[in-house]
Regions:
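Short, solvent-exposed, polar/charged sequence segments at loop or secondary-structure edges
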Residues: 80, 86-90, 105-145, 149-155
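Bacterial N-terminal signal peptides that target proteins for export
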Residues: 1-7
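C-terminal motif of bacterial Sec signal peptides marking the signal peptidase cleavage site
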Residues: 14-17
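Hydrophobic helical h-region of N-terminal Sec-dependent signal peptides
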Residues: 9-11
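A structural "domain/chain start" motif
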Residues: 19-101, 109-110, 115, 189, ...
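Short C-terminal domain-edge/linker segments immediately following a structured domain
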Residues: 100-106, 134-137, 174-181
């Protein structure tokens, strides 16, 4: 009986020691758990790009008297990692919109809008006097696009990862690039002698 109780207590202690502990972390805190692209990198890149754009003289000129309509193309991932570039694109779009200087056309949702307008205008269930009419959507004046690239170097137990984000703002009427910039992040990892 005593051996069974001791064995059960020992098993409970072992299983309890293997349990996971979950806690909330600060979403704005610097994340340095891996050399891979992470949330800190996303926030840094999005913030630096939008700040650079808003401080640009050419962007100040085009936003001085109006809020231009921008289409933001999803950032292209040219790295060897799986990086959710939609999150980077969303962060940049949100920061730009919150600046109060731009308006946006969400091209990812245009097909859904088209389906809804077709339903409203071609279905007997919808009161035609309240249906939204075709041809009233506004087109973009500018397109923001870019890519994220990386270079990875390994030397023995050391690893070096260099990320570069490049973005451009193009006037869709003239094809002129109104703004362009790059931001860079370098991360390094070294293993200790014992691999700890």
């Amino acid at each position: 009986m005593k051996k069974s109780a001791i064995a059960l207590l020992g098993l409970a202690a072992i299983l309890g020691g293997c349990s996971n502990q979950v806690s909330y972390g600060d979403a704005q805190a610097v994340e340095t758990t891996t050399i891979d692209f992470g949330s800190t990198d996303l926030q840094t890149i999005a913030g630096q790009m939008v700040d650079s754009m808003l401080m640009s003289g050419s962007v100040a000129a085009i936003t001085r008297e109006s809020r231009p309509i921008v289409f933001v193309e999803r950032i292209k991932n040219k790295t060897s990692e799986h990086i959710d570039t939609e999150s980077i694109t969303d962060s940049i779009s949100t920061k730009m919109l919150n600046s109060g200087k731009f308006r946006f056309v969400d091209m990812d949702r245009v097909e859904s809008v088209r389906e809804q307008l077709n339903f409203q205008n071609n279905d007997e269930l919808v009161n035609q006097s309240s249906a939204i009419q075709f041809g009233k959507m506004v087109g973009a004046q500018y397109m923001l696009y870019g890519n994220l690239a990386s270079i990875v170097k390994n030397a023995g137990s050391d690893q070096d990862v260099y990320y570069k984000m490049t973005m451009r703002l193009m006037d869709l009427e003239t094809g002129l690039i109104e703004w362009a910039d790059e931001t860079e992040i370098r991360k390094q990892k070294s293993k200790s002698f014992l691999g700890l």
